Design a protein with these regions (language model features):
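Short glycine-rich phosphate-binding loop at a beta-alpha junction
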Residues: 2-4
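Long, low-complexity, Lys/Arg-enriched
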Residues: 9-319
Length: 319
């Protein structure tokens, strides 16, 4: 965009109208002008002046905004900002913003449990961000955390479901919903699924029992008739166990996790699960508050003996 000859008002208006187009700006000036130096440039004395792409500077503030959104678990919004930067910054700045955009897309997909797709995007971003991290401490810390996350992600993908690793991922996801977004109904829904997954994984790994298709002879005789009556599907005749029945079977088989569940069930879990069942994302109309989530979260870590340090953390962006 050439704004030669424009008044100050015209030049500012032109810049404002074109800034979103990622334009470069030029101006024809010169060392010698008519009218004692205040008129037009004398023929043959013209000089072209080129200004840098303004988006190279605008992107710095956009990057900060994207970092804030990412740290609040608003991954899609952060990705939209970075995608805009990729399209508009100068060529030499594109690799960094493109890699950052790929990384954010990867974590957005992971947050939706799309692990295979997340892995592809995170690996695409890793090498470029590693190179930038050699000169930028903030980027280096992001890469270090991403490497740790990728190691965990690889294990999730390698391990058949249900698994204890998948449970850890659900717990971390619930923690993000509650701690970063304050979406306690969503958090409790994920937390409930993590409690269920724990039982499913323990029954599968320790006793070879699939809760979606339990074999009759794997059910202790004391529970067999009741389980056939209550949990056998009329459509396909498979025995399918919900959360409570899974833990009851686990306890009856001598599983430590099942015993731990029932040690706190009456006093802690039962009233909390009742509130969950009446929540808007389950079977009722009541919203869940922070206190209920935290109690259920703490009780889950308590009976499962899962320490906070085992819950993965996504990177914190300070770019």
């Amino acid at each position: 965009v050439d704004y030669t000859g424009g008044t100050k008002t015209m030049s500012v208006a032109l810049a404002m109208a074109t800034v979103d187009k990622s334009c470069c700006y030029s101006y024809v000036g010169g060392d010698e002008r008519s009218k004692g130096g205040v008129g037009i440039v004398i023929d043959g004395k013209e000089k072209m002046h080129f200004l840098e792409n303004p988006w190279d500077q605008i992107a710095l503030s956009e990057k900060k905004e994207a970092s804030i959104l990412f740290n609040k678990a608003r991954y899609d919004s952060a990705g939209d900002i970075l995608e805009k930067c990729v399209e508009r910054v100068s060529r030499e700045h594109k690799p960094f913003f493109k890699a950052l955009h790929e990384m954010v897309l990867g974590y957005a997909l992971w947050d939706r449990f799309k692990h295979s797709e997340a892995k592809k995007h995170l690996y695409r971003s890793r090498d470029v961000l590693t190179a930038f991290g050699s000169e930028n401490e903030a980027v280096k810390k992001v890469v270090e955390q991403m490497e740790e996350n990728l190691s965990f992600l690889e294990k999730i993908l390698e391990t058949p479901k249900p698994s204890h690793l998948y449970c850890l991922d659900l717990l971390a996801n619930a923690q993000r919903r509650a701690g970063l977004e304050h979406k306690y109904d969503d958090a409790v829904a994920r937390l409930y699924r993590s409690i269920e997954t724990l039982a499913q994984a323990e029954l599968k790994e320790s006793f070879g029992i699939d809760t979606s298709n339990v074999k009759v002879d794997s059910i202790p005789e004391r529970l067999r008739e009741e389980y056939l009556r209550n949990y056998q599907s009329k459509e396909d005749h498979r025995i399918k166990l919900p959360l409570y029945a899974s833990y009851r079977l686990l306890s009856e088989l001598g599983g430590k996790l099942g015993k731990g569940f029932f040690e706190i069930y009456e006093k802690e879990f039962k009233p909390l699960l009742s509130i969950r069942n009446n929540s808007i994302l389950a079977h009722g109309f009541n919203p869940v508050d922070e206190g209920i989530f935290q109690k259920l979260f703490d009780s889950t870590l308590k009976f499962s003996e899962i320490g906070h340090e085992r819950l993965l953390k996504f990177p914190t962006l300070n770019l």
